[in-house]
C-alpha cells in the first residue's frame, strides 16, 4: 500500500513503502547495484538495527509488523538472541524463510526452509537459553538488505531495588549494570546488551509502552544514554499509543497532545505506535491483511489527534507507517552513499584495463630483434652478472640464512659428498674439522669457495705416505747399486712423486667437482635475489598500472570475468610494470635506476635458461682450465731433488747409516796395519771414499733408508703441491669469475643472430599469446564500459525512486 494514502508527510524527500510493489524499478536497480558491487569486491556496509525493550512492550510485534508478514513471533518468549536478515532477491516473488544451521542444538546441523506460518513454532523448538543467536534469513524482491537483532527482553528496576550478587563489582558487565540501572536477569544480560550495542554501525531501537509521564519518565532513556550517550544512533518507539489516547487520563486538548508528542528531553527520532495484539495478528493470514490492520490502528490514533486539533508537524511521528518509512529512508540513504564508491571502483578497473590493453598493443608493435637484444643485454649485464659478481665477492642480498650452506649441508648434496682416497675409503677430519674456517656457518659464493680450499688443505695434511714394499723400493732403485746418497735420493724422489700423485689426484678431482657445484648453484640464488628485488619494487611503486595487482579486482570475483582478467594479467608481464621495455619498451611506465632491467622469468623462460647455460659452460670451461693448470704439478719429468746432496740431514743420515760405519771401520784397520805408509794413505783417501760410497746395502737397510727419506719428501711435496693448487684455484678459477664472466657471456649474447634471439624469446608464441590477450582485454574493456553505463542507469533509478505507474 502506498504510504501517501496513509500519511501525507513532507519531511521525507522520497517516501518509500518498504515492500511497496509500485517501486519495482527501484528494487531492481538496487539488486543490480549489489550484484555488481559483489563482483567488484566493493564493500557495502549492511545497516543493522538492535531492538531493545522490556517484556510486554510490543518489541516482537514491532519487528513482525515492520517485516510485513504475519509470523506470530512470540512476545517475550525468546530465551536466545534473534537475528533476522532481510535480503533482496529479485527471483523471490514470495518471501523465502531459511533457518540457518544451529550447532548448539542436536538435529539442526543444516539450513532449513520453512513456511511463514511455521516460523513461530520453529523458534519455539530452538528456544533454549544460550547466547548463540537464532539466525533467520528472509529473501524477498521488495527488501533492502538489513539485519534486525532482537536480544532477549530486559527487565529494569530502580537502582536501589536490587543488588547483583556473586560477581565482582569491578567487572565491565556489573559496571554497566550499575550505571544503566540494575538488570534483574543479572550480569549476563548486561554483557549481552553491551556486546550487541558497542558496534557504531548499529542503530539502537528502544521500545517502550506509552505512559502519561511522557518521554520524561522513560525507563529506556537512561539506558540509551549509557549505551549511546549522544543518542545519535538511537530511535525510540513508544507502543500502545491508543491505550494512552483512550485511557483513564486522556489528552483533553491539542496543547496537551502537542506537549507530549514534542517532548524535547529525548533529542532522537521518536515514534508513537499502536500495533496489533497477538490475537489480532493470529487472525491475519496474509501480508495485505496485516498491513490493513496496522493502517486501521494508525488511522484511529490520527483521528483522535485530529479531534484534539494537534499540530500536523507531529503527524510524521505517529504510526507504524512513519516508523517504517524512517527506517526505509535511513537504509536507502546508507546504500545511496555507497553508490559513488562503487562507480569509482568500476571506473578504476575500466581505466586500468584500458591501460593494459594499450600496453599490450605497444608490445605487439615493438616486438622486434632490436628490442629483444636490448632486453637480453640489459638483463645479462645489469641483473644476472651483477648478482653473480656480488655473490662471488661478498654480499648479504643472497640471504645467507636461507640460501647459505654449512659444511655439513654442502657435503649432504648429491653433487658433492665426503672426501675419499684413491682406495675409495672416506677421509675424516674428526676433531680437526674445526680447523676449517666457518665450518658451521651458512655461506655461499666466494666465501663458500674459500672454505672449500681451507678444507682441502686440512684434508691433504691428513694424507701420509703409505708403507712402501720392498719390491717398490727395489724397482725404484733399479740396476744401480745403493752405494751412495744420490742413488737413494733418486729412488726416494721417484717414489714420493708417484705416491703423491696417487694420493692427491682423487682429491683434486673432488675439489673441482665441489667447486663447480658451489658456483653453479649461484644461479638459483640469483633468481631469488631478482625476485626479492621485484617485491621490493612493488612495495616502492605500489600504484602499478597492472590490473592484476589489485587483489580485489573483479578477476577474483566473477567467474565470467576471472578467466579473462587473470589471463590478461599473466600476459601483462611484470616487465611492463617495471618499465623494462620487456618487448614493448614503453617509457610511459618506466622507473628510474637499475630496476628498469628486471625481467620476469616466467615471461621468457627459454631466454633465462639460455643465459644459465652460458654461465654453466663458462664455469665448466674455467674449471677445466684451472684443473689443467693444477695437473701441471703432477705432469713432470723424472727428477731428483739435488738439494738433498747438500742437505745436512741427508749427510748426517748417510754418515750414521750402517754402510758408512762399516767402511770407516775397514779404513781404520788398514791404517793400523800400515802405519808407516802415510803417503799411500793420503793418496788412497779418495779411493777409500769411493769404496765407501760403492758399498752395497742389503735390501732391508735400503728399504729403511728409502722409506724414511721418501716419507720426508712426500710431506714436503704434499705441502708444496697443496699450496700451489690453492693458489691456482684463486688465480685461474675465482678471479676469472669476478673479472671475465661479464665479457664472456656478453660476447655470447652479442654473437646471437636475430633469428636465434627470436627463437630464444619464442617470439612467435609470444605474439600469438599477446594477440589472444589483446582480444580478452578488449572484451573486458567493453564489458566494463557496458557495466559502467548500466550502473549509471541503475544508480539513477535507485537515487530517484518513483512508482512505476508515475514513471509510465
Curated annotation (Swiss-Prot):
Upon deletion of the gene, what happens?
Answer: Produced cells are larger and a large amount of them contains more than 2 nuclei.
Gene Ontology CC annotations of this record = cleavage furrow; cytoplasm; membrane; microtubule
Annotated spans, G3 motif: 150-153
Where it mainly occurs, coarsely classed, is cytoplasm
Q: Where in the cell is it found?
A: Cytoplasm
Please name the GO terms that the record assigns under molecular function. Answer: GTP binding; GTPase activity; microtubule binding
Fetch the InterPro entries from UniProt: Dynamin_N, G_DYNAMIN_dom, P-loop_NTPase
Please state every residue range assigned to the domain named Dynamin-type G.
Answer: 43-340
Q: Which SUPFAM superfamilies has this protein been placed in? A: P-loop containing nucleoside triphosphate hydrolases (SSF52540)
Q: Where is this region: G1 motif?
A: 53-60
Ranges of Low complexity composition bias in the record: 552-565, 665-694
- Supply the alphabetized keyword list: Cell cycle, Cell division, Cytoplasm, GTP-binding, Hydrolase, Motor protein, Nucleotide-binding
| Biological processes annotated in GO | actin filament organization; midbody abscission; mitotic cytokinesis; protein localization to cleavage furrow
Which EC numbers does the record give? Answer: 3.6.5.5
Q: Where is this region: G2 motif?
A: 79-80
Q: Which domain of life is it from?
A: Eukaryota
Q: Where does GTP bind?
A: 53-60, 150-154, 239-242
Q: Which portions of the sequence form the region Disordered?
A: 536-565, 665-695
Sequence segments annotated as region (G5 motif): 276-279
- What is catalyzed by this enzyme? GTP + H2O = GDP + phosphate + H(+)
Q: Which residue ranges does the record annotate as region G4 motif?
A: 239-242
Tell me the function of this protein. Answer: Involved in cytokinesis. May hydrolyze GTP.
Q: Which family does it belong to?
A: Belongs to the TRAFAC class dynamin-like GTPase superfamily. Dynamin/Fzo/YdjA family.
Q: What is this protein called?
A: Dynamin-like protein B
Q: Which organism is it from?
A: Dictyostelium discoideum
Q: What are the leading ranks of the lineage?
A: Eukaryota, Amoebozoa, Evosea, Eumycetozoa, Dictyostelia
Amino acid at each position: 500500500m502506498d504510504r501517501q494514502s496513509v500519511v501525507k508527510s513532507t519531511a521525507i524527500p522520497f517516501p518509500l513503502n518498504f515492500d511497496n510493489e509500485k517501486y519495482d524499478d527501484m528494487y531492481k536497480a538496487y539488486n543490480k547495484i549489489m550484484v555488481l558491487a559483489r563482483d567488484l569486491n566493493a564493500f557495502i556496509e549492511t545497516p543493522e538495527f538492535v531492538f531493545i525493550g522490556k517484556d510486554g512492550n510490543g518489541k516482537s510485534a514491532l519487528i513482525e509488523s515492520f517485516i510485513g508478514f504475519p509470523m506470530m513471533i512470540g512476545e517475550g518468549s525468546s530465551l536466545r538472541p534473534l537475528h533476522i536478515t532481510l535480503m533482496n532477491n529479485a527471483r523471490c516473488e514470495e518471501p523465502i524463510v531459511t533457518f540457518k544451521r544451529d550447532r548448539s542444538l542436536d538435529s539442526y546441523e543444516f539450513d532449513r526452509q520453512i513456511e511463514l506460518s511455521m516460523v513461530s513454532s520453529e523458534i519455539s523448538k530452538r528456544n533454549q537459553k544460550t547466547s548463540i543467536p537464532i539466525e533467520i534469513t528472509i529473501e524477498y524482491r521488495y527488501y533492502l538488505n538489513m539485519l534486525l537483532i532482537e536480544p532477549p527482553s530486559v527487565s529494569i528496576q530502580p537502582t536501589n531495588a536490587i543488588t547483583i550478587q556473586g560477581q565482582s563489582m569491578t567487572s565491565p558487565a556489573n559496571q554497566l549494570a550499575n550505571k544503566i540501572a540494575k538488570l534483574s536477569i543479572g550480569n549476563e544480560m548486561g554483557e549481552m546488551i553491551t556486546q550487541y550495542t558497542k558496534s557504531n554501525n548499529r542503530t539502537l531501537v528502544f521500545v517502550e509502552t506509552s505512559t502519561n509521564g511522557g518521554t520524561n519518565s522513560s525507563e529506556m532513556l537512561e539506558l540509551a544514554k549509557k549505551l549511546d550517550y549522544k543518542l545519535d544512533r538511537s530511535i525510540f518507539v513508544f507502543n500502545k499509543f491508543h491505550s494512552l489516547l483512550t485511557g483513564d487520563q486522556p489528552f483533553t486538548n491539542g496543547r496537551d497532545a502537542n506537549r507530549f508528542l514534542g517532548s524535547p528531553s529525548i533529542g532522537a527520532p521518536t515514534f508513537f505506535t499502536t500495533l496489533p495484539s497477538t490475537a489480532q495478528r493470529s487472525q491475519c493470514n496474509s501480508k495485505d491483511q496485516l498491513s490493513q490492520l496496522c493502517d486501521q490502528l494508525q488511522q484511529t490514533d490520527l483521528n483522535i489527534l485530529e479531534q484534539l486539533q494537534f499540530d500536523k508537524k507531529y503527524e510524521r511521528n505517529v504510526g507504524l507507517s512513519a516508523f517504517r518509512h524512517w527506517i526505509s529512508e535511513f537504509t536507502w540513504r546508507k546504500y545511496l552513499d555507497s553508490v559513488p564508491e562503487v562507480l569509482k571502483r568500476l571506473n578504476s578497473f575500466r581505466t586500468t584495463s584500458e591501460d593494459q590493453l594499450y600496453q599490450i598493443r605497444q608490445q605487439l608493435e615493438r616486438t622486434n630483434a632490436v628490442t629483444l637484444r636490448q632486453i637480453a643485454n640489459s638483463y645479462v649485464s645489469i641483473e644476472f652478472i651483477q648478482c653473480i659478481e656480488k655473490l662471488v665477492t661478498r654480499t648479504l642480498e643472497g640471504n645467507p640464512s636461507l640460501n647459505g650452506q654449512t659444511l655439513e649441508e654442502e657435503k649432504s648434496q648429491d653433487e658433492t659428498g665426503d672426501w675419499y682416497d684413491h682406495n675409495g675409503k672416506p677421509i675424516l677430519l674428526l676433531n680437526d674439522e674445526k680447523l676449517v674456517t666457518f665450518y658451521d656457518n651458512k655461506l655461499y659464493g666466494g666465501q663458500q669457495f674459500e672454505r672449500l680450499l681451507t678444507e682441502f688443505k686440512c684434508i691433504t695434511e691428513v694424507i701420509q705416505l703409505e708403507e712402501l714394499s720392498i719390491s717398490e723400493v727395489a724397482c725404484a732403485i733399479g740396476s744401480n747399486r745403493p752405494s751412495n746418497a744420490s742413488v737413494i735420493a733418486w729412488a726416494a724422489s721417484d717414489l714420493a712423486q708417484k705416491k703423491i700423485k696417487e694420493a692427491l689426484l682423487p682429491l683434486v678431482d673432488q675439489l673441482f667437482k665441489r667447486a663447480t657445484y658451489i658456483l653453479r648453484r649461484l644461479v638459483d640464488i640469483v633468481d631469488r635475489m631478482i625476485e626479492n628485488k621485484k617485491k621490493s619494487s612493488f612495495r616502492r611503486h605500489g600504484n602499478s598500472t597492472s590490473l592484476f595487482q589489485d587483489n580485489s579486482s573483479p578477476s577474483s570475483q566473477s567467474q565470467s570475468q576471472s578467466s579473462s582478467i587473470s589471463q590478461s594479467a599473466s600476459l601483462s608481464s611484470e616487465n611492463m610494470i617495471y618499465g623494462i621495455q620487456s618487448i614493448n619498451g614503453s617509457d610511459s611506465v618506466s622507473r628510474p635506476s637499475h630496476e628498469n632491467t628486471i625481467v620476469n622469468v616466467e615471461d621468457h623462460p627459454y631466454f633465462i635458461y639460455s643465459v644459465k647455460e652460458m654461465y654453466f659452460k663458462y664455469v665448466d670451461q674455467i674449471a677445466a682450465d684451472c684443473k689443467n693448470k693444477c695437473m701441471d704439478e703432477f705432469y713432470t719429468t723424472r727428477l731428483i731433488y739435488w738439494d738433498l746432496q747438500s742437505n745436512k740431514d741427508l749427510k748426517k743420515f748417510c754418515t750414521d747409516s750402517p754402510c758408512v760405519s762399516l767402511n770407516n771401520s775397514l779404513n781404520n784397520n788398514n791404517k793400523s796395519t800400515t802405519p808407516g805408509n802415510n803417503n799411500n794413505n793420503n793418496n788412497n783417501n779418495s779411493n777409500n771414499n769411493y769404496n765407501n760410497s760403492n758399498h752395497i746395502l742389503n735390501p732391508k737397510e735400503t728399504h729403511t733408508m728409502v722409506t724414511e727419506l721418501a716419507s720426508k719428501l712426500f710431506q714436503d711435496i704434499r705441502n708444496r703441491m697443496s699450496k700451489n693448487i690453492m693458489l691456482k684455484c684463486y688465480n685461474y678459477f675465482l678471479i676469472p669469475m669476478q673479472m671475465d664472466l661479464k665479457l664472456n657471456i656478453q660476447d655470447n649474447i652479442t654473437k646471437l643472430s636475430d633469428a636465434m634471439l627470436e627463437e630464444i624469446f619464442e617470439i612467435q608464441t609470444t605474439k600469438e599469446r599477446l594477440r589472444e590477450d589483446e582480444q580478452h582485454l578488449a572484451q573486458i574493456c567493453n564489458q566494463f564500459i557496458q557495466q559502467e553505463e548500466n550502473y549509471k542507469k541503475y544508480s539513477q533509478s535507485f537515487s530517484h525512486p518513483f512508482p512505476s505507474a508515475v514513471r509510465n
